UniProtKB/Swiss-Prot annotation:
GO CC annotation: endoplasmic reticulum; membrane
Transmembrane annotation, as ranges: 15-32
Pfam families for the chain: Abhydrolase_1 (PF00561)
MF terms in GO: palmitoyl-(protein) hydrolase activity
Organism taxonomic ancestry: Eukaryota, Fungi, Dikarya, Ascomycota, Taphrinomycotina
Function: Suppressor of bem1/bud5.
InterPro entries cross-referenced by the UniProt entry: AB_hydrolase_1 (IPR000073), AB_hydrolase_fold (IPR029058)
Family, as annotated: Belongs to the serine esterase family.
Protein name: Protein bem46
Length: 299
């Protein structure tokens, strides 16, 4: 009888193990197929693909521009130029955080525009807001390059100093773009961004993260790209209570950055999404721009 019981238990464990393996494989298959939806939740919050606030709602004059990428995607974007002598002011190229669209970031853009007197150019990535296409790492890299090239060909912005600003996944976009275009960019500002998508997986999936990471096709290897940035000033802004991107990843990126003009500032009380509300946030940025002579006209 004992032998029969042992055999029964063995069979239960065997089939339980097989069931667990099957569930794991199904989960991995789901993640592999839908990981772009998980990495780029462009439809969240509800209505984000249809409803895009405009700068006029925030008392900013603007031009809406549709950019065409080399792979035939149309990007929705806003350009806000200073009303007086815009050619003498720096231009902010803004890459927003995940979810939502560029319109949701206009309250932040307004501070850069009104308080720091910067021209501001912001895009909705492909698959976000009213931009066409579907988001991917390769696609967002094309989008960012398209945006920079537009500024470099613009009759006013081409005469200004370009400051690239990226939040969260926008930081990864900003790092990749800057690493390739250091002679065209005057400064880089990063907020709460990560070392790589693979490094983020254990935070999102604490169990089985090492296995799941092997199936990850969206890489965003910022820890490799940041090493290449040596020619321009870089400002790192980190919320110490960030619950999405572990703050040590920002510290690591700072350490790996090859620039001699890098600066790190942390905000002890801030989480992932409210760091820009931290005490002195925009003053830190203003001081950084002044220290690196960014507020003067481009030569």
């Amino acid at each position: 009888m004992a032998g029969s019981l042992s055999s029964a238990i063995f069979n239960v464990l065997k089939y339980s193990g097989m069931a667990s393996l099957a569930v794991t494989l199904i989960a991995l298959g789901f993640l592999y197929k839908y990981q772009k939806t998980l990495v780029y939740p462009s439809a969240f919050p509800q209505g984000s693909r249809e409803n895009v606030p405009t700068p006029k709602e925030f008392n900013m004059e603007y031009e809406r521009i549709e950019l065409r990428t080399r792979d035939k995607v149309t990007l929705d974007s806003y350009l806000m130029l200073q009303s007086e002598s815009p050619e003498s002011r720096p231009t902010l190229l803004y890459f927003h955080a995940n979810a939502g669209n560029m319109g949701h970031r206009l309250p932040i853009a307004r501070v850069f525009y009104s308080a720091l007197n910067m021209n501001v150019f912001i895009i909705s990535y492909r698959g976000y807001g009213k931009s066409t296409g579907s988001p991917s790492e390769a696609g967002l890299k094309i989008d960012s390059q398209t945006a920079l090239e537009y500024l470099m060909e613009h009759p006013i912005c081409s005469k200004t100093k370009i400051v690239v600003y990226g939040q969260s996944i926008g930081g990864a976009v900003a790092i990749a773009l800057t690493a390739k275009n250091q002679d065209r960019i005057s400064a880089l500002i990063l907020e709460n961004t990560f070392t790589s998508i693979k490094d983020m997986i254990p935070t999102v999936f604490p169990y089985g993260g090492s296995i799941i990471s092997r199936f990850c096709t969206e890489i965003w290897s910022s820890q490799d790209e940041i090493r290449k940035i040596k020619k321009l000033p870089v400002l790192f802004l980190s919320g110490e209570k960030d619950e999405i991107v572990p703050p040590p990843q920002m510290v690591l990126l700072f350490g790996l950055c090859g620039s001699a003009k890098k600066k790190f500032h942390s905000f002890p009380k801030c989480t992932h999404n409210d760091t820009c509300l931290g005490d002195g946030y925009f003053q830190v940025i203003a001081d950084f721009l002044a220290e690196n002579d960014i507020n003067t006209p481009a030569s």
